[in-house]
């Protein structure tokens, strides 16, 4: 069922990508008449989205990409600051047109959303700079207290990794602590209440540059996931317009330039992906 549905989506999207005149003509009537797309975003996940303390302006990869996509489509963006937990319900009730806020394209979310994927990410262990010598390999985290945002997929993914790599080998399980967000996990790490934390791999270089000699990444990401722009299942017209717009940005080089600005060239995707599958 899932594969059949993805093939159906891919076929629809191929048709839209063939006509890459990604302009307002491909947008739903409601967006054309409004002259804007209303986008759910919570700016608390640098460098993906954050508020610049100096100017109070929104900044980040998602912000730059969202503005560029809207421009490609001949419209504008109205960012709607919505808590992560409320984003999907806000989309379903029509309060927003789409979600663009560092959201992982997870199979369980595809029951209610279609995703246009735009970057690779992964769950990454890190610890405090002062304790970096204690953790040489990922199994050194077995039996340790590790924090991560409870609103993300990281707690489940970390528990799964622990079961396969700690408990299955006779090592103590990781003690997974769900925190109020990634900033809370970092605060608890600094206070010594956590031995380590887990966060999206795309955010850590930015944080390590911002707070030098504070954190240390250990090993490689232990999951691979795509970040995606989320659309209501019924909103195929808007989804396909955005897929065409993203293809246009990829071909012009603007997509790559946005990610290069934040040092995230390693997270780029090669071509359009819908719900985790490449669209030819």
Task: Give the ranges of each region predicted by the language model.
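Short helices/loops that flank or line small-molecule/ion binding pockets
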Residues: 68-72, 80-81, 85-98, 112-113, ...
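Beta->alpha turn/N-cap motifs
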Residues: 41-45, 80-85, 94-106, 121, ...
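Ligand-binding cleft/hinge of the Venus flytrap
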Residues: 67-73, 154-178, 208-212
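Flexible hinge/capping segments at coil-to-helix
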Residues: 128-146
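A ligand-binding cleft/hinge motif common to bilobed small-molecule-binding domains
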Residues: 85-86, 103-110, 156-162, 190-224
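Periplasmic-binding protein-like
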Residues: 43, 120-127, 209-246, 265-280
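Extracytoplasmic small-molecule ligand-binding "clamshell" domains
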Residues: 25-102, 252, 261
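A structural signal for short loop-to-beta-strand junctions that line the ligand-binding cleft
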Residues: 28, 58-62, 109-120, 216-219, ...
């Amino acid at each position: 069922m899932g594969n059949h549905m993805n093939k159906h989506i891919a076929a629809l999207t191929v048709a839209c990508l063939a006509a890459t005149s990604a302009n307002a003509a491909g947008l739903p009537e409601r967006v054309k008449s409004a002259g804007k797309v209303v986008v759910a975003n919570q700016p608390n996940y640098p460098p993906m989205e954050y508020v610049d303390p100096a100017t109070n302006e929104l900044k980040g990869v998602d912000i730059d990409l969202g503005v560029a996509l809207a421009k490609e489509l001949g419209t504008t963006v109205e960012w709607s600051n919505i808590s992560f937990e409320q984003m999907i319900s806000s989309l379903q009730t029509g309060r927003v047109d789409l979600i663009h806020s560092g959201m992982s394209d997870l199979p369980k979310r595809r029951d209610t959303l279609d995703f246009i994927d735009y970057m690779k990410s992964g769950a990454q262990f890190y610890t405090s700079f002062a304790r970096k010598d204690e953790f040489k390999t990922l199994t050194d985290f077995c039996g340790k207290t590790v924090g991560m945002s409870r609103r993300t997929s990281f707690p489940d993914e970390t528990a799964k990794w622990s079961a396969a790599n700690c408990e299955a080998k006779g090592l103590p399980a990781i003690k997974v602590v769900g925190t109020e967000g990634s900033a809370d996990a970092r605060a608890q790490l600094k206070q010594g209440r956590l031995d380590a934390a887990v966060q999206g791999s795309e955010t850590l270089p930015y944080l390590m540059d911002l707070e030098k000699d504070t954190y240390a990444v250990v090993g490689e990401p232990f999951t691979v996931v795509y970040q995606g722009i989320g659309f209501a299942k019924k909103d195929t017209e808007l989804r396909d317009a955005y897929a065409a717009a993203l293809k246009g940005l990829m071909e012009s080089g603007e997509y790559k330039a946005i990610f290069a600005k934040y040092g995230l060239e390693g997270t780029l995707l090669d071509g359009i992906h819908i719900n985790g599958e490449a669209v030819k």
